[in-house]
Amino acid sequence: NAGFRIATTGTPIENRLSELWSLFRFLNPHYLGSFESFNRRFAIPIERDGDREARLRLRRMIQPFILRRTKEQVLEELPAKTEITLRVEMGEEEFAFYEALRRAAVDTFADGGTAEDRRLRIFAELMKLRRACCNASLVEPGLRLPSAKQEAFLDILAELRSGGHKALVFSQFVGHLAILRDCLEREGVPYQYLDGATPPDERRRRVAAFQAGEGDCFLISLKAGGTGLNLTAADYVVHMDPWWNPAVEEQASDRAHRIGQERPVTVYRIVAKNTVEERIVDLHAWKRDLAESLLEESDAAVRLSAEEMLALIRETR
C-alpha cells in the first residue's frame, strides 16, 4: 500500500532480461505485462534473435523509470582505470592436450540424453576445458606441461615489481592459485593469500597486512574476495581466467579501483588464444552491448543455454 516505490541495484541485468521484469513487477506491477508476455515480446526476441526493434521498444518503456549513476560520475577524483586483455598462445604440447580434451568432449555429446542432463554434462566439460586453459595439471594431476598463462603472469609480475607496484591476482580455481602460490615461493616474492576457507579474523589480518605493505602480490579466489575488500595498496589487477559474469570481474577489480586509490589502476585479463576462453570474452562483449543499449553500460552477465555452451566447445579459430 506504499505511495512510492524505489528499487536500488548495482546490476539491473545480472544474468538475463527476466531479472529486469522482476524489478518492474515490484516497481510498477503489470507495466511490462505477465512473465510469459514479457518473454514472448522482449526476452526471447532480444536474447535469442537479436531483435533490434524489440530492444528499442523495451528501452523506451523502461528509460523514464531508471536513474543510473556510475562510479565515474559520482567519484570524479578517482584515478583512471585501464583494462588490457592479454591473449597468450599455448605451446604445442599444451594446446595439443587442450584440443584432445575438446574433441573428446564433442564426441561425448553425440549420445544425447535429457535437456537438463545434457546441459549439466556440457557445463562440466566446459569447466574442464577452462581449467586446461590455466594449467594442464588442474585436469590431470601430475602432468607437467609448460603453462603459457603462468609464464605471462610471471612476466607481468616481474615488470610491475621492478616499478614498485603491487598486484591483486584473481582466479576462479583455488587449485590454480595453489600453483601460482608455489611459483611465488620459488621466486621469493612476498605475498598474501585468501580463499573461501580463510577464517574471517585471518581474512581481516591478511588484508590489513597487505594494506600496510606486507606483500607485493595478493592471491584471491574470485568468489571469496571479489567483494567487500578494500585493497587500494595495489594498483594492478590480474584476472587469470575469465569468469562467466563480467560484473563479478568488475567488482573484483574494484577492490583496488575505489575510494582511497591515488594511482591509476591497470587491469589485465589473461586469455588463452584459440580456446573456449576467447568465446567467453566474445560473449561478454555481446552481452555488454545488449545491456548498454537498454541501461547505458549495465553490468550484464552470461547465462548460456545448452546449445550455446556446446557451441563454445565446438568452435575453433
What positions do the PLM features span?
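Conserved P-loop NTPase motor "coupling/switch" region that bridges the ATPase
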Residues: N1-Q73
